């Protein structure tokens, strides 16, 4: 493609499309936990949730439960799910393969109880 004035076509600069900040990435991930279907997917399709690193990351993300960070949350039920996941993971132990054990029931619990938790959240918002 040639330019009529002889100049090369403009390319997007990093100023026009900046990468998301760590704050934005973490906020997006935290809020995705409010989506029970996504959490179920994480716990059934991906083995990342059995990683001690993922356990540590979820624990680290609890700072979002406190102001001023919690004031940025649009879907507050995500904080409930974060605390729930961390509660389950506290009792997990690392096996000889370096994976977390003792979490086999977690996907089933999230899948079965998740819709009820979402309905309870909606009821709290309605009141």
Swiss-Prot record:
InterPro entries xref list: Med31_sf (IPR038089), Mediator_Med31 (IPR008831)
Single GO BP term: transcription by RNA polymerase II
Principal location: nucleus
Assembly and binders: Component of the Mediator complex, which is composed of at least 21 subunits that form three structurally distinct submodules. The Mediator head module contains MED6, MED8, MED11, SRB4/MED17, SRB5/MED18, ROX3/MED19, SRB2/MED20 and SRB6/MED22, the middle module contains MED1, MED4, NUT1/MED5, MED7, CSE2/MED9, NUT2/MED10, SRB7/MED21 and SOH1/MED31, and the tail module contains MED2, PGD1/MED3, RGR1/MED14, GAL11/MED15 and SIN4/MED16. The head and the middle modules interact directly with RNA polymerase II, whereas the elongated tail module interacts with gene-specific regulatory proteins.
Keyword vocabulary terms for this entry: Activator, Nucleus, Transcription, Transcription regulation
Its job: Component of the Mediator complex, a coactivator involved in the regulated transcription of nearly all RNA polymerase II-dependent genes. Mediator functions as a bridge to convey information from gene-specific regulatory proteins to the basal RNA polymerase II transcription machinery. The Mediator complex, having a compact conformation in its free form, is recruited to promoters by direct interactions with regulatory proteins and serves for the assembly of a functional preinitiation complex with RNA polymerase II and the general transcription factors.
Places the protein is found: Nucleus
GO CC, any one term: core mediator complex
Keyword Transcription part of the UniProt annotation: yes
Protein name: Mediator of RNA polymerase II transcription subunit 31
UniProt similarity note: Belongs to the Mediator complex subunit 31 family.
Recorded GO MF terms: transcription coactivator activity
Coiled coil location: none
Miscellaneous field: Present with 468 molecules/cell in log phase SD medium.
Domain of life: Eukaryota
Species: Saccharomyces cerevisiae (strain ATCC 204508 / S288c) (Baker's yeast)
